[in-house]
């Protein structure tokens, strides 16, 4: 089955899901969309799917043109904004899981690097739309040179299949949230969906910590993590070495081996990578190529 047909199946499955009242019921905020209202739960969901940077009038015109049987009523922007608050965000998580499951169950073959699937984790601080609800949840910020300007920001994080060009899981968190905590959430989704076997997960600088590396080892994730130049593992590395993360009885941890590589770059600088992939057939040059897939 080609990707076009897989996408068609995903769209059809989402249509089937959102038109099934039994499946929608858990995602309705209690005491809302229960009486005969001007806007139904399905109509609000459809509007969210069709929303774009165009005006509300243009979005509604497109819905009425393409989905005339939906009988979308004339409503105000305020009414739509209020109604969307009564949809539980769990609906969109469920639709995301549905699409990921269908994609990987129907794709005829997955691309490989040296026999492995490749995933990359990354996060970014982003500015969010200004509204009372985002200010209430994410906090309100101001900045120089205009202290009167108010805005809010959050941490967006994803795990991405770099060879098959697919986002498996994404999340958004408060601005000061930990990128590592967000990454752990992605790894647990991989585990729940059974997609982490025979895979390597690539992490940028800032994700490495002994706890993070131990989690990958203990849960069967092969990983490659870029190290900061100033930490001891980087300072002690000269080429390709095996070190030991010492366990302690106090924390109930055992010794864990870690492979550290010094990779020369084209500009004359060096980067340092930590991994639990110990196969000597995977050389430094291959790790350099592997880490580049993250971009």
Residues of each region from the PLM?
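Residues within the helices of the helix-turn-helix
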Residues: 61, 65
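Single, function-defining residue in the core of a domain
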Residues: 1-60, 74, 79, 84-87, ...
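Charge-biased, low-complexity intrinsically disordered regions
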Residues: 48, 66-69
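Short Pro/Gly-enriched beta-strand edge/turn motifs at strand-loop
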Residues: 137-143
């Amino acid at each position: 089955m080609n990707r076009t047909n897989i996408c068609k199946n995903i769209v059809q499955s989402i249509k089937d899901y959102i038109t099934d009242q039994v499946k929608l019921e858990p995602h309705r905020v209690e005491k809302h969309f229960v009486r005969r209202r001007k806007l139904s739960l399905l109509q609000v969901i459809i509007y969210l799917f069709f929303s774009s940077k165009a005006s509300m009038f243009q979005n509604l015109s497109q819905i009425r043109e393409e989905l005339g049987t939906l009988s979308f009523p004339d409503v105000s922007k305020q009414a739509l904004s209020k109604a969307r608050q009564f949809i539980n965000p769990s609906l969109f998580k469920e639709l995301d899981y549905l699409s990921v499951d269908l994609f990987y169950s129907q794709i005829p073959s997955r691309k490989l690097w040296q026999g492995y699937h490749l995933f990359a984790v990354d996060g970014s601080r982003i500015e969010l739309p200004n509204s009372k609800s985002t200010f209430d949840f994410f906090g309100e910020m101001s900045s120089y040179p205009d202290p009167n300007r108010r805005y809010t920001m959050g941490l967006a994080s994803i795990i991405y299949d770099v060879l098959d060009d697919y986002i498996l899981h994404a999340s958004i968190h408060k601005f000061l949230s930990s990128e590592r905590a967000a990454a752990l959430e992605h790894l647990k989704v991989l585990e729940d969906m059974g997609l982490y076997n025979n895979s390597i997960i690539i992490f940028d600088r800032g994700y490495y910590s002994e706890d993070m590396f131990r989690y990958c080892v203990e849960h069967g994730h092969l990983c490659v993590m870029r190290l900061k130049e100033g930490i001891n593992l980087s300072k002690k590395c000269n080429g390709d070495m095996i070190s030991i993360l010492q366990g302690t009885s106090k924390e109930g941890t055992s010794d864990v081996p870690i492979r550290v590589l010094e990779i020369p770059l084209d500009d004359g600088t060096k980067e340092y990578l930590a991994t639990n992939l110990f196969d000597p057939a995977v050389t430094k040059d291959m790790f350099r190529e592997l880490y580049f897939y993250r971009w």
